[in-house]
Amino acid sequence: MNFTKENCQFRKMLSTSSDLHGRLLRLSEPIAEILRRTQYTPQESSKVSTKDILLSLLPNTSSSRLANEESIKSLALACALLASSRSSTHELLSWIPENLSVMGESTFWEISRDCFSDFSSNSNAEKLVELVEDSEKIEMLPIVLPELKDGIEKSSLGKGSDAEDVSAAMARTPVGYAILAAHQLRWFVTQVKKPNLVKFCNLVVPCALTALDHWSPEVKGQGMITFVHLAKNVSSGDLGLYGDVVLDACCQNIASDDEIWIHVVELSVLLVTKIHPNNPRSPWYEKIMNEMLGHLERQPRNKERRITWLRFVEPLLNSLGLFLLAHFRRIFPLFFQWMHSDDAETVLLVLERLETVVRLTWIRHSPVFPRLVDELVSLYKESSMRKDRDDIRPLILRILMLLRQCKGLRFESAWSQYQEDPNLSTVSQHIWTSSS
């Protein structure tokens, strides 16, 4: 009796596996067809053919008729590679047409409903628990992440390596494989949201750290995007176990290529303010701030670099509070230079961050105060010739009013030289009327 029951279960398992294999074939056939028709000539220097890799991952009629973990994983990796190309301009992925990327993504979600417990677009908490507890489904991240980590690691280097080491590593394993694996890593992880992602921190963090430690900026960038998503979807307590290691990796990468500067700034600010939310005395605040300011000082006229920093730094400023006073000698020379930039975005962002700094510190015991008033007045006058003056001037007035509020007699003394300036009569009237 038991034998008959077990035999029936075995036959059912074989039948289900065979049906799933047929479904995987049907789902992948349109992808394979478009892929074969798509023109693609890999660059000789890359030594990697993305098209060949994709075709090798797709199931075919000659493979085993039973769908197993390996065949499901391969198709999932192919889908992730296709889907990740939608947000990439890298030569290894930019040739993939939009319709093929969309097809890869939709195919992944088709098979995920049958196979994966850790991927779900359903936000209902009970349904999520039900999916995770479904014993017939598999968790995909524990299967793919070790393989992707290995793919990234093969062309990585130890710290202190030089250009010759990079050449040797590329000869051993072309960096293209690491770039593709990093894109797959980023895509897989960013598809998993709360509350599922927390279960995989111990897998995601080592894999993303491997990407951050890689010498290729493209690989680093994908690792940073992965960490940003992780930090936004798990608690500070869950990240705290890896805090020092991850923050150290951030510091090591702040002086990075401009193409990934946006990611390293966003990640560094997000992590330090999340892991140490009410502890501006943490040495990580000083380390990260000093590294960022040093990178900005090396090329203060770099527009993209300064705009990125000004966009993302606000939470860091708020967390530092009065501890910002220790950074005045480095922050204000940059602010004074950027206030007179040609582009409106820089000027507006500087004024917004400047208002934050004044509000948090009240410019206590700082010799920077008189020059700050002078620079604001100078910018107010300059703005008369700018088309964006209606955006710039209200911000200047707000800062001047805040300075009068916090500095009192010192402000009146600094302003006395402008009291009779006919070009500033409306400014004086506004400051004193509004303040009173």
From Swiss-Prot:
Classification via InterPro entries: ARM-like, ARM-type_fold
Highest taxon of the lineage: Eukaryota
PANTHER family: OS06G0694100 PROTEIN (PTHR14873:SF1)
Protein name, per record: Uncharacterized protein At2g39910
Organism encoding this protein: Arabidopsis thaliana
